């Protein structure tokens, strides 16, 4: 997984949702510093809040972990690649 790409994607989706880092952090019950670290690719969101984060940003977990919007026709291929990447880590 490319943390920098994922971070940029989170930032893009947050801005599309017209949320500041602080507003997103408040919705998730975390600090805006955590959001900043995600968006700079320094850390990843904790698995315990990924579903809520995805719901707020209007994306799937697969899209979050791939760092891009996924069309339905490429969904199965992306799922398989994500599983392979996770197995390597």
Language-model segments: residues:
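The alpha-helix within a helix-turn-helix
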Residues: 14, 25, 54
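Short alpha-helical DNA-recognition segment
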Residues: 18-37
């Amino acid at each position: 997984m490319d943390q920098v790409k994922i971070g940029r994607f989170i930032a893009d989706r947050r801005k599309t949702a017209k949320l500041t880092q602080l507003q997103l952090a408040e919705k998730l019950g975390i600090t805006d510093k955590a959001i900043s670290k995600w968006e700079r690719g320094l850390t990843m969101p904790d698995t315990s809040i990924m579903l809520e984060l995805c719901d707020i940003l209007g994306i799937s977990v697969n899209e979050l972990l791939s760092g891009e919007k996924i069309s339905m026709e490429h969904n199965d291929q992306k799922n398989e690649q994500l599983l392979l990447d996770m197995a390597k880590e």
